[in-house]
C-alpha cells in the first residue's frame, strides 16, 4: 500500500501526534508473516432475500477449526443447524449471545446449548448488539444482519464476509473480552 502526502499535510500529521503507522495501514513491527502473505478480500450481501443466510451457512460449512459467534438476536434455524453441523465435524464452536436470548420465545440459543455447543449470555451491557462470526481465525462475518429469519426475509440488512487474518485477530480478541465476562447458558 502506498500513500502520498503533500509535505505540509505530512508535517501536520506528524506534529499532531497522529501515528504514521495508522495512516499507512501498518501496525508497529509489521503484520505477522502469515498475514503479510494474504490479501484481504470481502463479499457483501443485502437482505431481504439477498443471500445473507445462505452466505453464513456456506461459510460455516467451510469451517475447519474454530467458529466464534457474537449475536444480539439468534432465531435462524438454518444458521443454528450449520453451527451444530460444524461442531459435529470437530470444529470448536463457541457462542456469546445477548441476555434477551434467555427469554426469547423462538431463540436458537436453547437448540445450540442442548446440542453441546458452549453458549454464554453477555448481560454486562444494555444490549450486546454485536453480529459477528470469526471462522478459523481468518474470516469475519459482520454487519447489521441479525442471525434471524426476519433479517433474511423482511428486514433491510447487510452482511460482510471478510477474509483478513489481521482483522480476524482483532475481532477474536473482542469476542474473548465479551466471553470472559459472560455467564454460561445451558438452555431452558
Positions of PLM-derived features:
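N-terminal low-complexity, Pro/Thr/Ser-rich intrinsically disordered segments
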Residues: 29-49
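Structural recognition of the beta-strand scaffold that forms the well-ordered cores
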Residues: 43-45, 68-71, 94-97, 120-121, ...
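Primarily the HKD phosphodiesterase
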Residues: 56-118
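Bacterial N-terminal signal peptides
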Residues: 9-21
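Signature of lipid phosphatidyltransferase scaffolds
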Residues: 135, 139-188
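Bacterial N-terminal signal peptides that target proteins for export
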Residues: 1-11
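Solvent-exposed loop/turn segments at secondary-structure junctions
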Residues: 73-77, 99-103, 125-128, 139-140, ...
